[in-house]
Amino acid sequence: MQKLKSIYITKVCPILVNEFLYTNFFEIPKINKVVISRGFGESCNSSKILESLLVELKNISGQKPILCKSKNSISNFKVKKGMPIGMFVTLHGDKMYSFLDRLINLSFPRMRDFNGLNIKGFDGFGNYNVGLSEQSIFPEIEYSSILKNKGMNITIVTTAKTDLESFSLLKGLGFPFCV
């Protein structure tokens, strides 16, 4: 069993039950999925950079990313129909817990000038978004192999109904929030 999943079952669930007075086991919030997405910007013209960004996200997540292509042309942005403009990966189950464990314990401490996660990342429905400015904080990425420094967005989707429930869940799992 994943370390983070066992922490959730043994420590976080009892705390949430006492804090929010849940009567049913299925009311306790849990993490449904983690979505890692990144846009290409101007680097979508170079196939070499595009391939390196795909390999980086595959190494970070352990899963092949899905390319997002433009639905129509926008001449102001030099985007043609069918051109790749981004990619995303959706993680569930053990891969999700493994990624979150590496994110909390390895990646966040490697960030420069990191004072904790911002509480404003909650969306009002119990989900949390965090934006990363560079991919070099992940131990799977070698700094010498980075062709273009691009960030990514990580969305943590929970079953929590409110931001307070989601905050308690993520704080119990070890997310370093700045309060």
Curated annotation (Swiss-Prot):
Gene3D superfamilies given in the database record: 3.30.1440.10
Gene Ontology CC terms: plastid; ribonucleoprotein complex; ribosome
Organism the protein comes from: Euglena longa (Euglenophycean alga)
Role according to the record: Binds 5S rRNA, forms part of the central protuberance of the 50S subunit.
GO terms, molecular function: rRNA binding; structural constituent of ribosome
Encoding gene per record: rpl5
Quaternary state and interactors: Part of the 50S ribosomal subunit; contacts the 5S rRNA.
Key words, A-Z: Plastid, Ribonucleoprotein, Ribosomal protein, RNA-binding, rRNA-binding
Localization per Swiss-Prot or TrEMBL: Plastid
InterPro entries in UniProt: Ribosomal_uL5, Ribosomal_uL5_bac-type, Ribosomal_uL5_C, Ribosomal_uL5_CS, Ribosomal_uL5_dom_sf, Ribosomal_uL5_N
Protein family (similarity comment): Belongs to the universal ribosomal protein uL5 family.
Name of protein: Large ribosomal subunit protein uL5c
Any one GO BP annotation for this protein: translation
